[in-house]
Amino acid sequence: MTQDLADMLTRTARLIAGDGHAAGLKPVQWQALRYLAAANRFSRTPGALAAWLGQTKGTVSQTVAALERKGLVARTGDAGDRRLVRLALTPHGEALLASAPDTIAEAMLAPMAPADRAALEALLARMLGGFLAARGHRPFGLCANCRHFRRDAEGGNPHRCALLGVPLDESDSRAICIEQEAA
Protein backbone atom coordinates (compact mmCIF):
# COMPACT_ATOMS: atom_id res chain seq x y z
CA MET A 1 0.00 0.00 0.00
CA THR A 2 1.27 3.44 -0.81
CA GLN A 3 1.63 6.09 1.84
CA ASP A 4 -0.75 8.32 -0.15
CA LEU A 5 -3.54 5.74 0.13
CA ALA A 6 -2.92 5.26 3.85
CA ASP A 7 -2.97 9.03 4.35
CA MET A 8 -6.23 9.38 2.39
CA LEU A 9 -7.89 6.61 4.41
CA THR A 10 -6.73 8.17 7.67
CA ARG A 11 -7.83 11.67 6.68
CA THR A 12 -11.21 10.41 5.46
CA ALA A 13 -11.74 8.50 8.72
CA ARG A 14 -10.84 11.56 10.81
CA LEU A 15 -13.19 13.83 8.87
CA ILE A 16 -16.04 11.33 9.17
CA ALA A 17 -15.33 10.81 12.88
CA GLY A 18 -15.81 14.54 13.46
CA ASP A 19 -19.52 14.36 12.55
CA GLY A 20 -20.76 14.79 16.12
CA HIS A 21 -18.82 17.96 16.91
CA ALA A 22 -21.76 20.16 15.88
CA ALA A 23 -23.82 18.44 18.59
CA GLY A 24 -21.11 18.97 21.21
CA LEU A 25 -20.00 15.36 21.17
CA LYS A 26 -16.58 13.81 20.88
CA PRO A 27 -16.11 11.54 17.86
CA VAL A 28 -16.28 8.37 19.97
CA GLN A 29 -19.50 9.55 21.62
CA TRP A 30 -21.12 10.21 18.23
CA GLN A 31 -20.03 6.78 16.98
CA ALA A 32 -21.45 5.17 20.13
CA LEU A 33 -24.83 6.83 19.53
CA ARG A 34 -24.85 5.74 15.89
CA TYR A 35 -23.93 2.18 16.90
CA LEU A 36 -26.69 1.98 19.52
CA ALA A 37 -29.22 3.19 16.94
CA ALA A 38 -28.12 0.50 14.47
CA ALA A 39 -27.56 -2.45 16.85
CA ASN A 40 -30.12 -5.11 17.68
CA ARG A 41 -31.33 -5.66 21.24
CA PHE A 42 -28.69 -8.36 21.88
CA SER A 43 -25.85 -6.08 20.83
CA ARG A 44 -26.64 -2.98 22.88
CA THR A 45 -24.27 -3.82 25.73
CA PRO A 46 -21.06 -2.16 26.89
CA GLY A 47 -19.07 -5.21 25.76
CA ALA A 48 -20.53 -5.20 22.26
CA LEU A 49 -20.03 -1.44 22.00
CA ALA A 50 -16.37 -1.89 23.02
CA ALA A 51 -15.93 -4.56 20.35
CA TRP A 52 -17.56 -2.36 17.68
CA LEU A 53 -15.45 0.68 18.57
CA GLY A 54 -12.27 -1.34 19.04
CA GLN A 55 -11.76 0.12 22.51
CA THR A 56 -11.32 -1.23 26.01
CA LYS A 57 -14.32 -1.77 28.27
CA GLY A 58 -12.95 0.90 30.62
CA THR A 59 -12.77 3.50 27.86
CA VAL A 60 -16.27 2.60 26.69
CA SER A 61 -17.54 2.84 30.27
CA GLN A 62 -16.31 6.45 30.38
CA THR A 63 -17.92 7.17 27.01
CA VAL A 64 -21.25 5.71 28.15
CA ALA A 65 -21.07 7.65 31.43
CA ALA A 66 -20.56 10.91 29.49
CA LEU A 67 -23.52 10.11 27.23
CA GLU A 68 -25.64 9.32 30.30
CA ARG A 69 -24.73 12.68 31.86
CA LYS A 70 -25.84 14.37 28.62
CA GLY A 71 -29.15 12.49 28.79
CA LEU A 72 -28.53 10.65 25.50
CA VAL A 73 -28.12 7.06 26.74
CA ALA A 74 -29.63 5.03 29.58
CA ARG A 75 -28.34 1.85 31.23
CA THR A 76 -30.74 -0.83 32.40
CA GLY A 77 -30.32 -4.26 33.90
CA ASP A 78 -31.32 -7.33 31.92
CA ALA A 79 -34.39 -9.08 33.29
CA GLY A 80 -33.06 -12.53 32.41
CA ASP A 81 -29.44 -12.02 33.50
CA ARG A 82 -28.82 -9.54 36.30
CA ARG A 83 -25.09 -9.44 35.50
CA LEU A 84 -25.82 -8.00 32.06
CA VAL A 85 -26.21 -4.28 31.39
CA ARG A 86 -28.25 -3.08 28.41
CA LEU A 87 -27.78 0.30 26.76
CA ALA A 88 -30.50 2.28 25.04
CA LEU A 89 -30.83 5.64 23.41
CA THR A 90 -33.05 8.00 25.35
CA PRO A 91 -35.71 9.99 23.48
CA HIS A 92 -33.23 12.90 23.56
CA GLY A 93 -30.53 10.69 22.00
CA GLU A 94 -32.93 9.47 19.31
CA ALA A 95 -34.00 13.05 18.56
CA LEU A 96 -30.39 14.20 18.29
CA LEU A 97 -29.61 11.50 15.73
CA ALA A 98 -32.84 12.14 13.82
CA SER A 99 -32.16 15.87 13.60
CA ALA A 100 -28.55 15.51 12.50
CA PRO A 101 -27.81 16.88 9.05
CA ASP A 102 -26.39 14.61 6.38
CA THR A 103 -23.24 13.03 7.63
CA ILE A 104 -19.83 13.87 6.26
CA ALA A 105 -19.68 10.35 4.81
CA GLU A 106 -22.99 10.90 3.00
CA ALA A 107 -21.70 14.20 1.61
CA MET A 108 -18.53 12.49 0.37
CA LEU A 109 -20.48 9.66 -1.27
CA ALA A 110 -23.28 11.76 -2.79
CA PRO A 111 -21.43 12.85 -5.96
CA MET A 112 -20.24 9.31 -6.71
CA ALA A 113 -21.94 7.18 -9.34
CA PRO A 114 -23.89 4.22 -7.90
CA ALA A 115 -21.44 1.75 -9.47
CA ASP A 116 -18.50 3.56 -7.86
CA ARG A 117 -20.22 3.54 -4.46
CA ALA A 118 -20.95 -0.18 -4.79
CA ALA A 119 -17.34 -0.90 -5.76
CA LEU A 120 -16.03 1.18 -2.84
CA GLU A 121 -18.40 -0.59 -0.45
CA ALA A 122 -17.25 -4.01 -1.65
CA LEU A 123 -13.57 -3.08 -1.33
CA LEU A 124 -13.98 -1.58 2.13
CA ALA A 125 -16.04 -4.57 3.31
CA ARG A 126 -13.33 -6.94 2.10
CA MET A 127 -10.57 -4.82 3.66
CA LEU A 128 -12.33 -4.45 7.02
CA GLY A 129 -13.53 -8.05 7.11
CA GLY A 130 -10.06 -9.39 6.37
CA PHE A 131 -8.48 -7.18 9.01
CA LEU A 132 -11.00 -8.18 11.68
CA ALA A 133 -10.77 -11.89 10.84
CA ALA A 134 -6.97 -11.86 10.90
CA ARG A 135 -7.03 -10.42 14.41
CA GLY A 136 -9.85 -12.58 15.76
CA HIS A 137 -12.30 -9.68 16.12
CA ARG A 138 -16.03 -10.02 15.61
CA PRO A 139 -17.19 -8.79 12.22
CA PHE A 140 -20.74 -7.70 13.21
CA GLY A 141 -23.30 -7.59 10.41
CA LEU A 142 -26.99 -7.56 9.63
CA CYS A 143 -29.03 -10.16 11.45
CA ALA A 144 -30.89 -11.11 8.25
CA ASN A 145 -27.57 -11.99 6.56
CA CYS A 146 -26.49 -14.38 9.33
CA ARG A 147 -26.23 -18.14 9.05
CA HIS A 148 -28.29 -18.44 12.25
CA PHE A 149 -31.18 -16.35 10.91
CA ARG A 150 -34.36 -18.32 10.22
CA ARG A 151 -36.82 -16.35 8.11
CA ASP A 152 -40.55 -16.85 8.76
CA ALA A 153 -39.85 -19.35 11.55
CA GLU A 154 -42.32 -18.14 14.19
CA GLY A 155 -46.04 -17.43 14.17
CA GLY A 156 -46.17 -14.22 16.24
CA ASN A 157 -42.66 -13.11 15.39
CA PRO A 158 -41.74 -13.76 11.81
CA HIS A 159 -38.16 -14.88 12.33
CA ARG A 160 -35.88 -16.75 14.73
CA CYS A 161 -32.23 -16.71 15.79
CA ALA A 162 -31.08 -20.33 15.85
CA LEU A 163 -27.93 -19.41 17.80
CA LEU A 164 -29.69 -17.67 20.69
CA GLY A 165 -32.94 -19.63 20.35
CA VAL A 166 -35.12 -16.52 20.40
CA PRO A 167 -37.83 -15.09 18.16
CA LEU A 168 -36.92 -12.05 16.07
CA ASP A 169 -39.09 -9.30 14.68
CA GLU A 170 -38.50 -7.24 11.54
CA SER A 171 -36.56 -4.54 13.39
CA ASP A 172 -34.17 -7.18 14.77
CA SER A 173 -33.57 -8.57 11.30
CA ARG A 174 -32.56 -5.14 9.94
CA ALA A 175 -30.12 -4.38 12.77
CA ILE A 176 -26.46 -5.22 13.25
CA CYS A 177 -25.53 -8.03 15.62
CA ILE A 178 -22.36 -8.94 17.48
CA GLU A 179 -23.16 -12.64 17.00
CA GLN A 180 -23.56 -12.36 13.22
CA GLU A 181 -21.81 -14.98 11.11
CA ALA A 182 -21.99 -14.68 7.34
CA ALA A 183 -24.45 -17.07 5.74
Question: What are these model-predicted stretches?
Answer:
Residues 15-26, 107-115:
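Short amphipathic alpha-helical boundary/capping segments
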Residues 26-27, 63, 71:
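Short alpha-helical DNA-recognition segment
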